[in-house]
C-alpha cells in the first residue's frame, strides 16, 4: 500500500541540492503544494523546506497545519532553524546529510532540532553516517524521536550498474549510489529499510527494540498514520516481519496474510 509521499523537493537550497536536479529548485509555493496535494489525493504527508530561502518561513507558517514540515537540504543557521520550528516545522530529513554540522559557535539546525523535540531521520546504511553518530543521535534525541530511513532510489534491490535519478546518471556499487559525473556526491542509497534496521543493530550497536521502533512506530507517528500502521494493536493492520536471532527474515505478513 502507498500510505504517504515525502515531497523532498523542490523547496530546498540551491546550495545543498545533493543529488537532486538543480534546475527544479524553487522557493516554497503554497499554491503549488496544494495543487500537487490535490493530484496526490491527499497522500503528501511530508514537505521538505530550506527555511533560510526567501519566503520559505512564510510557507511553513501557512501550511504546517495541512502537512508535516521537515527541514532539509538547507544552509540554515541555528537562529533561522529555531524560527522554522517555532513556525510549525516538526521534522528533520536525513539528519547530518545536506545541512550544516555542529560547532561550538555555530550550533546549526541540528541543535535547534534537539531543543525543539523534532523527529529526526537517520540513514543507517553504513555509508551516509558513521556508526558513532548514529549511537550519538539515539542517545541525545532519544529512541522515540529517531526515524530510520533507507533514502533508497530506483536501484534498490537491483544489480550494480548505471541508473537514473531526477534525470541525472547514477552509479550503484553495493549499498552506495553516487552521481556518475560527481562520484563524491551520494545519490541516495541502494539499500532497503529492513537492511538499514539490521545494520543499525548488528553493525552500529543500536539496541534491537530501539531500532525496530525507529523503523516502524516512530515514522508512522511522525506523519500521522499511527492509528493504522507502525505497531501491533487492536484495530491496526497486521503488517509483520518475523526474523530469527540474526535478523534474517523468516516470514512477512501483510494485513494478516502471509506473503513471504
PLM ranges: what are they?
Residues 109-121, 138-150, 155-236, 240-242:
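His/Asp/Glu-enriched, well-ordered alpha-helical/loop segment
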Residues 7, 63, 92, 200, ...:
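Conserved, mostly hydrophobic/aromatic
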Residues 34-160:
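Active-site core of metal-dependent hydrolases
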Amino acid at each position: 500500500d502507498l500510505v504517504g509521499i515525502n515531497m523532498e523537493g523542490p523547496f530546498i537550497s540551491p546550495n545543498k541540492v545533493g543529488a537532486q536536479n538543480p534546475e527544479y529548485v524553487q522557493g516554497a509555493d503554497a499554491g503549488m503544494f496544494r495543487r500537487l496535494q490535490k493530484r496526490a489525493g491527499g497522500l503528501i504527508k511530508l514537505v521538505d523546506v530550506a527555511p533560510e530561502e526567501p519566503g520559505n518561513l512564510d510557507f511553513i507558517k501557512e501550511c504546517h497545519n495541512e502537512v508535516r514540515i521537515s527541514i532539509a537540504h538547507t544552509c540554515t543557521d541555528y537562529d533561522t532553524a529555531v524560527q522554522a520550528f517555532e513556525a510549525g516545522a516538526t521534522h528533520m530529513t536525513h539528519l547530518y546529510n545536506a545541512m550544516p554540522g555542529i560547532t561550538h559557535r555555530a550550533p546549526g539546525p541540528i541543535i535547534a532540532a534537539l531543543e525543539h523535540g523534532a523527529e529526526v531521520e537517520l540513514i543507517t546504511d553504513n555509508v551516509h553516517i558513521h556508526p558513532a553518530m548514529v549511537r550519538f543521535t539515539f542517545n541525545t534525541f532519544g529512541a522515540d524521536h529517531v526515524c530510520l530511513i533507507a533514502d533508497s532510489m530506483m536501484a534498490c534491490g537491483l544489480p550494480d550498474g548505471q541508473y537514473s535519478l531526477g534525470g541525472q546518471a547514477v552509479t550503484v556499487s553495493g549499498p552506495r549510489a553516487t552521481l556518475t559525473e560527481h562520484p563524491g556526491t551520494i545519490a541516495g542509497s541502494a539499500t532497503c529499510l529492513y537492511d538499514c534496521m539490521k545494520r543499525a543493530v548488528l553493525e552500529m550497536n543500536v539496541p534491537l527494540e530501539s531500532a525496530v521502533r525507529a523503523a516502524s512506530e516512530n515514522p508512522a507517528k511522525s506523519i500521522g498514520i499511527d492509528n493504522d500502521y507502525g505497531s501491533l494493536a487492536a484495530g491496526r493492520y497486521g503488517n509483520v516481519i518475523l526474523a530469527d536471532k540474526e535478523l534474517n527474515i523468516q516470514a512477512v505478513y501483510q494485513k494478516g496474510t502471509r506473503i513471504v
